């Protein structure tokens, strides 16, 4: 339909997990048990499709910082409690997300990957900044601040010896995550964003940098989803 929602559901039974990531951030933090008043209308479309399609398995993801009332509505509608998984178990990125699924999921531990492990060796000069840096302290995850914005998050410069904070769907305006390398500050490249989301190198190549940053920041961490889908093999073996 014209509003982006489905007018009717498929009549077949899907053999693969039905996946959905409803709008995050502000939309995800406001919730209602009524589709008519919910800001995140897509979630209730997801529920409708689940009931009509009746897939064997399903998976839904949203931000861990969402309001408890919204989380409870989702859990009530889906009949399962969410599992908290941080992407730091599989990548150099801290990214806590809630996953609702009827697939059994094993506990995962934080891995040893750090931001330094995903950095490119040779980076174009266009990614570097010349803004002054303050509060340089190489013992901290946020090891400096770059004086270019009034937004505290955009000022943060990350230490490559630590994990990177959560990637977000930014397009430009110096909002990209920044790293301190050899005494200089630069934004992370799109390829480094891909690696933090465990995508293949240059997976998003072919579109503008801004579009790449936005798409990658909006996406899932691939290895987290692969970890969840391992549970499908457990189900198959039991059956």
Show the residue positions of the predicted features.
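Conserved active-site and SAM-binding loop architecture
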Residues: 1-239
């Amino acid at each position: 339909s014209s509003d982006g929602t489905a007018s009717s559901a498929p009549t077949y039974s899907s053999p693969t997990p039905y996946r959905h990531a409803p709008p995050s951030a502000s939309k995800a933090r406001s919730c209602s048990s009524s589709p008519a008043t919910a800001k995140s209308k897509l979630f209730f479309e997801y529920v409708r499709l689940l009931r009509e399609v009746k897939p064997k398995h399903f998976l839904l993801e949203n931000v861990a910082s969402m309001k408890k009332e919204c989380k409870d509505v989702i859990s009530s509608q889906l009949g399962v409690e969410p599992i908290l998984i941080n992407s730091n178990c599989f990548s150099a990125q801290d990214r806590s997300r809630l996953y609702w699924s009827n697939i059994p999921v094993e506990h995962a531990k934080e891995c040893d990957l750090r931001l330094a492990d995903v950095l490119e060796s040779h980076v174009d000069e266009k990614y570097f900044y010349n803004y002054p840096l303050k509060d340089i302290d190489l013992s901290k995850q946020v090891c400096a601040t770059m004086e270019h914005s009034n937004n505290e998050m955009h000022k943060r410069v990350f230490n490559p010896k630590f994990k990177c904070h959560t990637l977000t769907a930014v397009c430009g305006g110096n909002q990209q995550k920044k790293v301190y390398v050899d005494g200089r500050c630069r934004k992370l490249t799109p390829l480094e964003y891909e690696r933090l989301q465990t995508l293949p190198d240059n997976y998003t190549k072919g579109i503008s940098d801004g579009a790449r940053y936005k798409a990658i920041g909006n996406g899932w961490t691939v290895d987290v989803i692969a970890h969840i889908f391992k549970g499908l093999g457990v189900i198959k073996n039991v059956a």
